Amino acid sequence: MLFRSEHKDFAKADEVRTFPNGQLELLHVGGSDIGRLILQPGWRWSEHVKPLAGTDLCEAPHFQYHVAGTLRIQMADGTSFDAVPGQVTALPSGHDAWVVGDEPVVVVDWWGASNYAKS
């Protein structure tokens, strides 16, 4: 199968999903989805996305590049860590996350974006 070149821009996302204190900009490119999450200070998955997901923890696995801000991630087993700009995280399902500090968090997500915050 031959692929054709594609060039897309998050400023002209194929789909935008908004939720309290955040949004997901989704691109359909190369036969896959890639998302940019922008999360405002005060955002927390268990408060702002849990009602949409209907699960106690985020069940979407993620493979993310962290562009801006600090995101604290807490796994189901209670372990937690902070993800900061320049880092890459691979998260299995079963986690909560929240913005730490006054700077918005921006992440680019290759795995969990297609179903994220989908009502």
Each predicted region: which residue ranges?
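Short acidic-glycine-tyrosine-enriched beta hairpin
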Residues: 75-94
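Short, conserved beta-strand element in jelly-roll/cupin
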Residues: 39, 55-73
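Short beta-strand segments
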Residues: 35, 79-81, 106
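Glyoxalase I/VOC metalloenzyme domain signal
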Residues: 11, 41-43, 112-119
